[in-house]
């Protein structure tokens, strides 16, 4: 009898999956949602797959996530490293419903490559899972990540490309093109949203450059290597980072190396992230008397909608300024 009831419950759950509310536009991570929701404003809904408080670096797909991918009219994802967990379900839907940012030709020359040699010296390390987000009991598959694949020259692409205003404008154009195909009756509104996005981003970028200009010589360390596009766009002087992969805390050799750099350079701040809280940052800050700040590369506190991408960049700028100005 129990077995019959169990099977009945499973059948009911499966039957209700297609009835779940779905967004016409689904972004893999929130920063992409900032871009898409700005262009889709008044046209269709936007949802973000990875929930607030979670990190895409260790996210496991749930059955409900797979259903969202299958039922969305448009899925926007990076296509590499950050959201590699989406590769399987996306391969099962119509490619016309997908924007794979890593495949956009105009973006390839703009990708930032960095050298990670001294962070791969056989150093001991430990996993730094310190964020607590809930998972459904059933997952489509386990973690499937390829953190910063390194080429023969020791260089790897930084896929946190949403921090590049230039790349984000290209993505916004691609989203506008897709939405225009899907909603030809909203062509004028989509064009207006795109124009508003570009204008607002330009205006906000000018303000951010002016805000951060006095801080351009202030050195700092970030928790993981996610901010190079932002730093390049707005002239900040990043001294280094604690780890390439935020799931792996730096080991003793790396910490010793960072401490030396803090002492040799004029480092003003060490930045942690809300998704991860490694003790090493607080420990180093106490021993070196360097300020601790917080950067959120996902923008959990920023609401989706018009101007949300510009607001996200401004929130990052404010976090930098708050710590580096001390």
Task: Identify the function of each model-found stretch.
Residues 23-326:
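Extracytoplasmic metal-acquisition and chelation regions
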Residues 1-22:
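Gram-negative bacterial Sec-dependent N-terminal signal peptides
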């Amino acid at each position: 009898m129990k077995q019959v009831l169990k099977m009945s419950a499973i059948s009911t759950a499966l039957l209700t999956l297609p009835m779940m509310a779905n967004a016409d536009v689904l972004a893999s991570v929130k920063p992409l949602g900032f871009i898409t929701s700005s262009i889709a404003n008044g046209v269709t809904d936007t949802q973000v797959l990875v929930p607030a408080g979670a990190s895409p670096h260790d996210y496991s797909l749930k059955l409900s996530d797979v259903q969202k991918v299958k039922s969305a009219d448009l899925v926007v994802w990076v296509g590499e490293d950050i959201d590699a967990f989406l590769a399987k379900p996306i391969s099962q839907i119509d490619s016309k419903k997908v924007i794979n940012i890593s495949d956009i030709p105009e973006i390839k020359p703009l990708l930032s490559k960095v050298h990670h040699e001294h962070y791969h010296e056989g150093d001991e390390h430990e996993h730094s899972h310190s964020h607590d987000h809930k998972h459904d009991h059933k997952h489509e598959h386990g973690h499937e990540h390829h953190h910063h694949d390194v080429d023969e020259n020791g260089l790897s692409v930084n896929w946190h490309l949403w921090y590049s205003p230039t790349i984000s404008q290209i993505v916004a154009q691609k989203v506008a093109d897709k939405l225009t195909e899907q909603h030809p009756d909203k062509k004028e509104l989509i064009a207006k949203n795109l124009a508003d996005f570009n204008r607002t981003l330009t205006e906000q970028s000018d303000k951010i450059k002016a805000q951060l200009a006095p801080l351009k010589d202030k050195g700092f360390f970030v928790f993981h290597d996610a901010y190079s596009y932002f730093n390049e766009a707005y002239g900040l002087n990043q001294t280094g980072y604690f780890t390439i992969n935020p799931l792996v805390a730096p080991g003793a050799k790396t910490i010793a190396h960072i401490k030396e750099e803090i002492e040799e350079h004029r480092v003003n701040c060490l930045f942690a992230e809300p998704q991860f809280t490694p003790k090493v940052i607080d420990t180093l800050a106490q021993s070196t008397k360097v300020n601790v700040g917080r950067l959120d590369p996902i923008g959990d506190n920023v609401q989706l909608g018009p101007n949300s991408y510009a607001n996200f960049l401004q929130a990052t700028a404010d976090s930098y300024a708050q710590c580096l100005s001390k």
